[in-house]
Regions:
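Alpha-helical solenoid repeat scaffolds of the TPR/TPR-like class and their adjacent stem/linker regions
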Residues: 1-203
């Protein structure tokens, strides 16, 4: 029904970029990625500065395994809005599952590390980020496929964790408090946070 409604809206006003973008979102949810690509491409053709459509197009290219195209979409947004946190985040966390060679792995690892530095720099120099902007960025992607490189990721994961901590402290300062060392003999409780608890094939 959503597809039908948006297609009718496109017929009524084919030059409204937002409708094409929304139709693309529906097609993406349905797993019809090529149709989603066509919708997003039409949206940015109508409005070249439509940052959400560029980001959405990049996300679909990622699903299709076209990682360089995805990164190009995020770079376009950064050209339009240099401080766009979501695009920097998406670009940083874009990894192939399988690499052509070891050199390509090195390039993506450097991109990831450079991405953490860039976002830290944005946090140092920009104070306008809202809670929604930070949450939208962090939930847009993760570094899940970093582990597929088969390297020692401790250093990179520490930098990523420090960045996550810094971002969450900005929006949830009440949860960032010094904790006293537990000297009792009780078991330490460890919490896990993961989107897979909600959306996963085995849940």
């Amino acid at each position: 029904k959503a597809v039908s409604c948006y297609e009718k809206a496109v017929q009524i006003n084919p030059n409204f970029a937002g409708t094409h973008n929304n139709l693309g979102l529906v097609f993406k949810e349905l797993g019809k990625f090529q149709k989603a690509v066509s919708c997003y491409e039409k949206a940015v053709q109508i409005n070249p500065n439509f940052v959400d459509a560029h980001n959405n197009l990049g996300a679909v290219y990622f699903e299709l395994g076209e990682h360089q195209r995805a990164i190009s979409c995020y770079k376009k947004v950064i050209q339009i809005e240099p401080n766009n946190l979501t695009s920097h985040w998406l670009s940083m966390n874009t990894f192939p599952i399988i690499y052509e060679n070891l050199k390509e792995i090195d390039l993506y690892r450097k991109r990831f590390e450079d991405g953490t530095k860039k976002i830290n720099h944005l946090l140092d120099t920009q104070s306008q980020y809202t809670k929604k902007q930070i949450v939208d960025a962090m939930k847009s992607s993760t570094n899940f496929y970093l582990s597929y490189q088969g390297r020692n990721d401790i250093n990179l994961q520490q930098k990523y964790a420090n960045l996550i901590e810094r971002l969450t402290e900005k929006i949830y300062p009440q949860f960032h408090q010094e904790r006293t060392i537990n000297k009792s003999k009780k078991f330490i409780k460890i919490g896990f946070v993961s989107s897979f608890f909600k959306n996963h094939t085995i849940s």
